[in-house]
Design a protein with these regions (language model features):
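Juxtamembrane/interface segments at transmembrane-helix termini
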Residues: 11-24, 54, 112-117, 157-158, ...
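Non-cytosolic membrane-interface motifs at loop->transmembrane helix junctions
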Residues: 23-25, 157-170, 303-315
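Long, contiguous internal "core" modules enriched in hydrophobic/ aromatic residues
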Residues: 68-70, 75-254, 272
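Hydrophobic alpha-helical membrane-insertion segments
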Residues: 31-49, 211-220, 281-289
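TerminUS-proximal long segments
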Residues: 64-75, 258-263, 267-325
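Transmembrane-helix bundle segments that line or gate the permeation/cavity pathway
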Residues: 2-120, 134-137
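Cytoplasmic juxtamembrane interface segments
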Residues: 7-30, 180-200, 253-260
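Alpha-helical transmembrane segments
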Residues: 18-21, 194-198, 238-241, 265-279, ...
Length: 325
């Protein structure tokens, strides 16, 4: 959400959009979470890495061990280079994580500085500089966000891969961020702030939530259909573990309902996207729905059939959500 908020901000300048002038500082503020997120990611990896990522177990690369895995061994350079001949510390993986967060935060601070200059000095110089930097940011984001999705999510199921996974994760990030921007905009407006924001602005951002919920469903179905129709065991196992499982089977369909069916039906009428009462109901559901989506991406790969959902899962979500806000 932090980096996609900055993406939303940069997109407005690259596209020369004017409608979002009253709300663009909300997603820009999300970027302040980036250094905290980077620290939490590093701590989580060093503390829980062996539990989260199967590829971190050294026996998988030892040809004399009964745990040796030829498929994972073929990918060791992606994680351990330049120590790939003697895998111990995943230097390349950690370096990418540090590089991504460092680069994202650097670009965020540059955009924020230019935004403040535009407010203080006026004129068009800062605007043109922001537009150029935003275009650069969008290109960098396109590459780094996809690789981050491979590293932090897809590598949990180390044997499995999907060429659409970067797009799929981005779609989930994007819809969640749009829903949060909408919810915070409504909250601030009801508190007497953002007087410039009217029903037309809510309608525009509501259309974004509606349209990209459909986009998420399109990417989900495209990935699912290709794998289902090809019926290659190495690929179908990803969905089998989530569909034919007592722990995840129900959530599999709840995910589709919350992230596509519900927002599609509730936000289809024009008036629904213009009134705060409906948007205040739909957007938290969408945010929670995409938390469910990431739960399905991560938990079956780490806990297998031992996964569940209870106070720990929901409590963690509330703690991180509260800290972010």
């Amino acid at each position: 959400i932090a980096i996609v908020g900055v993406f939303f901000f940069a997109l407005q300048y690259a596209a020369q959009a004017g409608w979002s002038a009253g709300i663009k500082r909300i997603p820009l503020a999300f970027g302040s979470w980036l250094p905290i997120a980077g620290i939490l990611m590093l701590v989580s990896f060093f503390v829980f890495g062996h539990d989260l990522f199967h590829w971190t177990h050294h026996d998988l690369y030892d040809t004399t061990s009964h745990e040796f895995d030829s498929i994972i061994n073929a990918k060791k350079a992606y994680f351990f280079w330049p120590l790939s001949e003697h895998p111990s510390t995943p230097v390349f993986f950690i370096a990418r994580m540090l590089f991504f967060f460092g680069l994202w935060y650097y670009l965020f601070t540059k955009l924020r500085k230019l935004a403040f200059q535009e407010d203080l000095e006026g004129g068009t110089a800062s605007w043109y500089n922001m537009r150029k930097l935003s275009a650069v940011f969008l290109i960098i984001f396109a590459v780094t966000s996809s690789i981050a999705a491979w590293d932090w999510v897809m590598s949990i199921d180390t044997h499995w891969f999907s060429t659409m996974f970067g797009w799929y994760v981005f779609a989930s990030w994007w819809v969640t961020t749009l829903a949060l921007i909408t919810f915070i905009t409504i909250h601030l407006k009801e508190k007497g702030l953002l007087s410039i924001v009217n029903e037309n602005h809510l309608h525009d951002i509501g259309k974004f939530v509606f349209a990209f919920s459909v986009f998420w469903a399109y990417i989900w179905f495209s990935q699912f259909l290709l794998i289902y129709y090809a019926n290659i065991p190495e690929e179908t196992i990803y969905f089998v573990e989530r569909w034919n499982n007592d722990q995840y089977g129900i959530i599999f369909f709840v995910n589709l309902f919350l992230n596509f069916v519900l927002p599609f039906l509730l936000l289809m009428p024009r008036d629904a996207k213009r009134h705060t009462a409906i948007l205040k109901v739909v957007t938290p559901i969408v945010i929670f729905g995409h938390w469910i989506d990431f739960y399905l991406m991560i938990t079956p790969g780490t806990l297998k059939e031992n996964g569940g959902y209870g106070l720990v899962e929901f409590g963690t979500m509330l703690i991180y959500g509260g800290a972010f806000l």
